[in-house]
Amino acid sequence: MKYVCIHGHFYQPDRTNPATGRLEPELSAAPFMNWNERIFSECYGVNASTPIVDGMQNNYHHLNTDFGPTLLRWMEQERPLTYEAIVKSNKQGAGKRYGTGNVMAQGYHHAILPLANPNDIETEIIWGMRDFEYR
């Protein structure tokens, strides 16, 4: 028997203005207000609830994925139903896949770890693991 694994790497940087703590309009994301909303509409949201012949399907249940902590933090606040669908798919997968889910942790930011200094590598990994455990 042959197997295939499809991996989805999902990441959006923190786009908030540090002075205001809010997302500001991004003209290049039109017709949406910002890139988080645009990518959510085109990718993250539709994969959580995809129409199929006999109903709806959560594609995240069938993918191996990693989600950036900054994306999940935004999604937890702004799109909680999709956030919950992602968390739920990982927990459901844990009972079917040797005790582990189908989502894996990633470094906190989108750093290229082999190019980072040892202190930054350790920080990225620790922060990423702690965020993963929180979720």
Feature map (PLM): residue ranges:
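Carbohydrate-active enzymes and regulators
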Residues: 1-135
